[in-house]
Structures are given as C-alpha cells and as structure tokens.
C-alpha cells in the first residue's frame, strides 16, 4: 500500500520535536561529567566551537537531505545518488541498535521516579540499590514495558498528532524543570565532617572556570575528542533521525534558523544540566563524587538528594521527571525512524509497523534486561572497561557506526550540498 507522507504543521513543531530528539539522557548524565573531567570551561569552549561549526554543518545536511528527498533515511541517500545508497543502510543500523536498549534505560528512570514519588527516596541512596534493581529478573522488565508502551503510543499517534503534539507540551516543561533545579543547586551549602564548607556557587566556579593544570597537547586532543564524541551523542546526526524528521518539514521553513534554534535548545539544556548537577554533587560529595553515566544518575545523585534532607525527595521527583521526559522524546525519535523506514520497506501502514517495531523492541529490550542476570557476561572493550550486553550495543553504535557515518557525511558534504541545491 502507498502511505501518505506525514509532516510537521510548521517550524515550531519541527524545532521542538528535533530538540526533543537531541536532548536525551546524554545531555544530563554525560555532558556534566565530561565538563568536570576535561577542565570545566575549557571543555565548554571546545564543545561550543564544534557545535557551531562541525555540528551545524552535519545537522543542516541531515535535515536538508530529508526535506529535499521527502524520503526516510534508508532511501534518501540513494535518491540523491546511487553511489551513496550504502549510507542509508549504515544510518538505519544505528537506531536499530539503539532501540534495543534505550527503553531499558527509560525503565530505570521510571523506577527511580516511582521510588521518589511513593517514598522519601532514601532507599535509592543505599549501597547496592541500583545493582540489586538491574540484576533482578522481573522489576526492570516491568518498568521497561511501561516506558516502551508510552513511547509506542506517541509514535502510533503519528507525526502531527503524536510526536509534534507531545513535544509541544513536554519540551517547555522539561526546560522549566531543568532551570528550576539549576537555580536551586546554586543556593546549596554544606559543611562536611572535616569542617569544610562548600557552596553551590563554588561548584559553579568549578564548572565554568577553565583548568589548564597539567595541560599538554595530548591531553588537549583528548578534550577535543571527548567534545566530539558528545557532539555525536547529543545532536542525533548521522543516525537517520534528523533525515526522517527533515522529510516531514515544509518547504517554506527556514532551515538555517530552525537548525540554529535546535542547537541553542540542545546546548542550552546540556549547559543547564551541568549547572543543575555539578554544583550539587560538588557541595555534598566534592570533586571525587563526579561520575559518568548510570553511576552519576542512579548512585551519586540519590546520595546528594538524601543529603538535602526533606527537600531531597522533591528534588528527586523533579529531576527524574525531567530525565524521563528527555529519555522519552529521544526514544520516540529513534522508534519513529525505524517505523518510517519499515513503512517504506514493507509498504505497510503506521499501525502495522508500530506493532512490528514494538515487538522487535520488546524482545531485544527483554534480552538486554536479562543481560544483567540470566545472560550475564563481562567483555573487555577496547577502551579497557568491562561491559555487559547493553554496554556492548551502546559501544558499537556510538563509537563505531555513528562516527564512521558522520565522517563520511562531513567529507562528502560539498557534494551533498551541490545536489541538494542544484537547479
């Protein structure tokens, strides 16, 4: 059957939906850690330069390809030129891999939100709570199912009535929640057992002040590489997502303006996440409390919330609600990309492809959940870290497939632009 091509109602819907895709858990649990690790303001400056140059070029290229071809990511490159068809398959591989585990992470967030909602949240700060949760065989699957069902419902509703409609509500609320916690974190003050008092403003200075201590050419290149990897992780480029969303954009939308707004929203939330997290962790745990990824979100921050006393529960609720919104909008964009591609591949309706992608997501996500117990193993990655099944899937997609596609896109961007705007 022939499917009518959906679309956003206008520029605002596209910007909010795309910002929702870009603003994910990586902005909140990875960006602040990299800032703390890589010299604070130095990392911010390097990242900003990359976003305004490299990132803007790739984002605009992705969206322009989608709008010009009105095709999903799988077919868009081949529509421009047969020799680039292979890029469509590479970009299709990325959301296929990410969808296997993103709803699992969403389930973790839902679990912690529920804990703070129904209790004072102190149990979340206890040693071993996170490990005990993810290694259980039932609870992670239940919360993953809830998150996946909500994601599938939004995608099933379609572009304008689902993705755009919910993004219009969720993204402003997400921004307000992040701003609220960021402002609150600056008011914090704590005196530890040794009598040392640390304040939120001192934590802000730690976050913003460039630290060149021990800086060498090699360490600076590491900062650049970290900033580049965060760029890959954050803007949703080279994953087929922005090509798919670009295919829904009306021809009268100013892409340069819209893409600039997306970058401002995405980078702004990442920056505010740093203001939200780094000062509060610094106040209660010091510099040594900084951690990356799940350790920061599900271990360090609950300890910070517990140290706040009664207000910690409220902050915990607001934080995990904001993180849940960020995870939901990103997961929706990943599933939408798969559904849009499958609608073209199999010539089936959105309803049928939502069901098929939903079953795929469910089976693979359950497998990922069981990777911490029934299918448990440890594999040493090239970077030396020990990885389970989720880590392996994330490593393959974000360390290999995405950078390769992004590099090819950047190197061939001149050719793409000649084809996109030839008369």
What are these regions (language model features)?
Residues 1-29, 58-63, 67-79, 85-89, ...:
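Membrane-interface "cap" regions at the ends of multi-pass membrane proteins
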Residues 6, 35-61, 139-140:
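Extracellular loop-to-transmembrane helix junctions
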Residues 10-48, 241, 257-260, 264-267:
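Transmembrane helix-boundary motif of multi-pass solute transporters/channels
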Residues 34-38, 64, 79-80, 86-95, ...:
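Membrane-water interface regions at transmembrane-helix termini and the short interhelical loops
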Residues 55-74, 84-129, 324-343, 403-404:
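Hydrophobic transmembrane alpha-helices that form the core helical bundles
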